[in-house]
Amino acid sequence: MWTSIAAPMMSWVMPEVLVNRGCIIRPFENRGDRGNREIISVTSVDSCSVYTLVMVAALLAAAGRRVASAEEAYRANPRPPTDGLVGANYTPAYAVNQVQFWHDFRPEVVERELAAAKKYFGITTLRVYLHNVNFDEEREKFLANIEQFLQICDRHGIRPGFVFFDDCHRHEGIYLDEPTEPVKGYHNGRWAACPQDRDRDPNDPEKLKPYVQEVIRPHRDDRRVLWWEVFNEPHLKSAYSVRLRKLGYAWAKELKPVQPVISCWDDNEATDVVDAHNYRAAFDRWDRQAELNPAKGCVFTEAGARWYAPRPSNGEPCEVIRWLAGRKAVGKYVPGVYLCWELMVGNSNCRWYWGTPEGTPEPTVPWCGLLWPDATPVSLAEAEAVRRYVTGQPRAMFFDDFQDAPRPSRPGWTAYGGAGPGDSGYLPLGAGTKMVAGHPKWTDYVLEARVMLKSETRGNAGLVFRVNDPGPGHDEMRGYYVGLDTRKLYLGKMQNNWQPLAEFDLTKLDCRVRPDVWNLLRVAAEGPRIRVWLNRMHPSADPDRGLRIELTDEREPILSGAVGVRSHLVEAWFDNVVVLPAEELP
């Protein structure tokens, strides 16, 4: 029975240690290979604690400074503490599935996408699927592509884990020489279960052993690889899948890799680390999963997704990061997370929800995916939240995710003309209300927020920027306003009255603005130049990449001011408000 002993409380993260019959073993290592373990004999729990203190002092002395962030602790440890593991599942934007990824391997695309993942999010790890079809039909090319992929990851300080088998989605019809196209509206419609049903011989599962072992063997002591995952979401009522999970784990462990070998679901006999999935925003269940087996630790290899109408949030990135930070703040164990299902909003079509019918219009905000195919963030607020958590280095001038919004006031905000903020998790405004934050001397910046109209009326809601002299009246301020109703996007100037500047017809977009649906609104103000983006979609439906309005205000432009949110003749909700210097605009 493993016993967990927490490291002394400090302002940096120390890996917890595990005690078993007088030995300390660092977590996230291969417990089946004594030759690769760092084992120190101790005589008691007290001496273990003393050893931990000594090691803390030694590490600090060796480093010459305190470890200031999870990212630094991650880099300093070849078997990192799980709180430094923040990433996403990865298939390049061009690929419909993992078979196409490895067959049509494009290193220049992978390089660009991973560089962006590190730049915008500080990502430290990726979860990457393999397939026996590639191994069986082009073995040398497949293994060479894995090595090249690892080289790219290593250049960007990213450590991937690899998945061998998967019971999800298409069990038939996937062939190396028969490429398939994405189907609009069909979530993961071309994803390849592994193995395909034609290769699932219950009398000969051993034929898959070379696939597992020949991938692991050249990398069994390769610190660029974080873990090996035998089976993603096996059907537990399938005798074949349950048996293959057990066999795959044994095949991997035969090679005594330095990396842990893991497998779904949660804790089981075929995993060295609890392998958890969660797509709900009720974080009490996340807590239970994180603490299922303290001796093993936990990684959420699928950690939530965004809100998709009419359903509630599935654990969007800002919520998950706030949950992690909350656990860390009170000294609780912090698991690793792979956010929002996948890194790229690409041809996997996971921007749509599970089970959406073919032909469904583009969503206003992708359900899954952190980066667009051009390697820019879907949400600057999400990028700020994740990067700040991982690196400890904020870039935002202002950020509010409203995860702890109190009644009836909100620190950093001033309300004008109506009721103040309400429930936690978002900012609700009554009709005829505006709230202002920031500094009147701010000049060039990018402002982004999510906006939801609560009914279809002649009213509108949106963002105010370069705000000066605000008051309680609807138009009482000097500055700019960009707002939307279900038909149009409006940009105008306010000087205690309304001066329209530009409009955009929203009805011509494939994604439609509707009540009770989130919209993603972004404004860049640089000198007199103003640009507005709304509800960017996949490039197949949106060649303008979300840019809806662009103009230069040549008549007495307002060049500085604060920011805020506004509702006019309609109740509206707001979330994930961020302000960044203009140079941070992708």
Task: Please place each PLM-identified region on the residue numbering.
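Extracellular carbohydrate-recognition regions
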Residues: T391-A415, P586
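Localized edge beta-strand/strand-to-loop motifs within extracellular or lumenal beta-rich domains
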Residues: V517-R531
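Short, aromatic/His-centered strand-loop micro-motif at the edge of beta-sheets
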Residues: N497-L520
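Short carbohydrate-recognition loop motifs
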Residues: P411-M435, Y445, Y490, G561
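Secretory/extracellular carbohydrate-interaction modules
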Residues: L429-Q495
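Ligand-recognition surfaces built from glycine- and aromatic
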Residues: E554-P586
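Active-site mouth of glycoside hydrolases
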Residues: E72-V273, H277-D284, A295, W307-P312, ...
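Short, solvent-exposed beta-strand-to-loop segments that form ligand-recognition rims
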Residues: N535-S560
